[in-house]
Amino acid sequence: MPRVKRGFKARQRRNKVLKLAKGYRGARSKLFRSATEAVDRALNYAFRDRRVKKRDFRALWIARINAAARINGLSYSKLIHGLKIAKVEVDRKVMADLAVSDPRGFAEIASLAKANI
């Protein structure tokens, strides 16, 4: 069986990993094995946290809506229930933004929900 030296392709593969590890501290940006471990871990965290970010933002929106709803004499769950009965389809992202930037507008939505409970 002939000997395979794996010159170009192996170097190309290693350089790809080292390029991804650029900016890491110490050996993690210089040595292929350390860089591979660091890059694999970083990509796993990135994949996981793209999903966690969605959960975190939804929790933030709910906390903001709840705070604004309580100022208007409702709990979060009562507000959402009232809006469902009134057939108002405003998503939580928009409602949270409204609660922060336009409290009067949010108060109108809250009064609409209150009327339909």
Swiss-Prot record:
Entry keyword Ribonucleoprotein: yes
Protein name: Large ribosomal subunit protein bL20
Single Gene Ontology BP annotation: translation
Encoding gene, per UniProt annotation: rplT
MF terms (GO), sorted A to Z: rRNA binding; structural constituent of ribosome
Domain of life: Bacteria
GO cellular-component term (any): ribonucleoprotein complex
Keywords carried by this UniProt record: Ribonucleoprotein, Ribosomal protein, RNA-binding, rRNA-binding
Family designation: Belongs to the bacterial ribosomal protein bL20 family.
Role, per record: Binds directly to 23S ribosomal RNA and is necessary for the in vitro assembly process of the 50S ribosomal subunit. It is not involved in the protein synthesizing functions of that subunit.
Gene3D superfamilies per UniProt: 6.10.160.10, Ribosomal protein L20
Entries under HAMAP family matching the protein: Ribosomal_bL20
